[in-house]
Structure formats: structure tokens, C-alpha cells
Amino acid sequence: MKPSPANYEKGKWWDLPWTIVDGCTRVSPACDNCWAMAIARRFGRSTEPRFRPDRLEIPHRRKKPAVFAVWNDLGHPCLDWLEINRAFLAMAETPQHLFLVLTKRPARLRDAREIPNIWLGTTVEDQPRADERIPHLLDTPAAKRFLSLEPLLAPVNLSRVPGLEILDDKPFPISLCVIGCESGPRRRPTDLAWVRDLVEQARAAGVPVWIKQLEVGGKVRHRLEDFPEDLRIREWPE
């Protein structure tokens, strides 16, 4: 299963959001210009993280298969394991959907069990976060694992991370690399050379690449035709 053609055109690697956790707290530089927190503050909403059990039925109510992005961070320390398990159970009970669980705190999900329709991913904005988070992701059972290199704030050398060596006799443990610049009026720059280097690394490992958005001509672009020709890449794992 993959995102719909309409979402493909927009660069979205999901069809529908599932906000099972409201709010979040800063954990690393990627959080500094968080649009969700800015909107919450603008409208006077609380940014304190809390689990939303009233939304557990959302995937059950949709019968048509869809790719769900699980927002916000299921690995947040404010959640206890019972709450995390309830979210995973709701996903397991709706196998017609694919769930993409993205966390900046992958160590908290290491006790999760592998479920065929759940992919686990972690955000990697720079080398320190790659070194810190990817090993935890690799230690977590998952049908597939992915990296969200967005916002990409610095060059990242994946080969420096233990477990990401390219070995002829062992499948590469990452199934997808999503790459993108930061958005918003206070966005920090993403050098296209960093993006190209990551694409080369992914190619060497046989990993599909999904380039979500890039800053071109001073604007954040989402359409492939606005990207440099060699970066018009949106691939999906088989």
C-alpha cells in the first residue's frame, strides 16, 4: 500500500493523519520551529502532551484502506505503556490500513511487537540525532523501518551508525528514507548537497527515497517538477 496519487503530487507520504496524542515537548533542534506548537499557541491551546483514547476508533470507522501518519509522538514519556499498547492494538485491529509511526524517542518503543501493517520511523535532522536514535530504531521489532530526514539541518553520514553497514549477506534494515527541508517563515536552510549525498547513500544501500519538499528559488516547493531534475524522486518500498 502507498499514498494516493493526489498525496503523492503534494509530497505527502501519508493519506490521513491520526492524532492519537495531543501536544508535545521539545526534544532536539528539529522541534525549534514546530508548526503544530505554533498553531496551538496562536489559538490558546495547551501544548501539554496527552493521550486521546476518544480517537482510538478513527481507523475502525474507515473501511477503505489508507496510509495513516500517527501524530504526535507515541514515544513521548508522558504516555504509559498501557496507552501505547492501546494505540498499537487499534492499529493491529485494522489491517486494511498501513500505519506510519514516527517518533523522536524510539527508545521508548523498543518493547513494541512486530505487526505487519505498522512501520516504525524516527526523525533524523543531523548527525548527533542519527547516532542517538537510529540504533534504538534498529533494536525495535518492526515490519519495516524508515527515516524521516526532515527538517534536514546538517549533513548526515548513515554509514557511521552501527547497524547500517552495507553487507552482502544481510538485508539493509531501513526500508525508506524521507528527505525534506524545513518549512515556515523561520526555516533554516537545507543544502541541496546534503540531500544529494543522502540520495547517493540510499542508492548504495538499495533503499527507496521520498523527497518531500525542497527550498528552490527562495520558496519551499512540493511538486516534483519544481525540484532540480536529479532530485525528482518519490519511491516507495515494495
Where do the PLM segments sit?
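Conserved Radical SAM active-site core
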Residues: 1-118, 127-131, 156-171
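Surface-exposed cleft-lining segments at the edges of enzyme active sites
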Residues: 70-79, 122, 181-188
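Active-site beta-loop-alpha junctions enriched in small/polar residues
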Residues: 73, 104-106, 123-127, 150-154, ...
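A structural motif corresponding to the C-terminal end of an alpha-helix
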Residues: 90-97, 140-143, 198-208
